[in-house]
């Protein structure tokens, strides 16, 4: 499940393996 702005691939997972919010949406990290 992707949570947050869908402008980039999921870079972070919670302990359940779900996408977590990516506040650097649209930026290279």
UniProtKB/Swiss-Prot annotation:
Localisation per UniProt entry: Secreted; Nematocyst
A GO cellular-component term linked to this record: nematocyst
Transmembrane segments: none
Keywords linked to the UniProt accession: Disulfide bond, Glycoprotein, Nematocyst, Secreted, Toxin
GO terms of molecular function: toxin activity
Record has Oxidoreductase as a keyword: no
Residue positions the entry lists as glycosylated: 1
Annotated disulfide bonds: 7-19, 10-25
Keyword Signal: no
Record's miscellaneous remark: Negative results: does not inhibit voltage-gated potassium channels rKv1.1/KCNA1, rKv1.2/KCNA2, rKv1.3/KCNA3, rKv1.4/KCNA4, rKv1.5/KCNA5 rKv1.6/KCNA6, Shaker IR (with inactivation domain removed), rKv2.1/KCNB1, hKv3.1/KCNC1, rKv4.3/KCND3 and hERG.
Protein family according to the UniProt entry: Belongs to the sea anemone BBH family.
Official protein name in the record: U-homostoxin-Hdu1a
Organism encoding this protein: Homostichanthus duerdeni
């Amino acid at each position: 499940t992707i949570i947050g702005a869908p402008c980039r691939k999921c870079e972070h997972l919670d302990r359940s393996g779900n996408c977590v919010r990516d506040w650097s949406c649209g930026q290279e990290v």
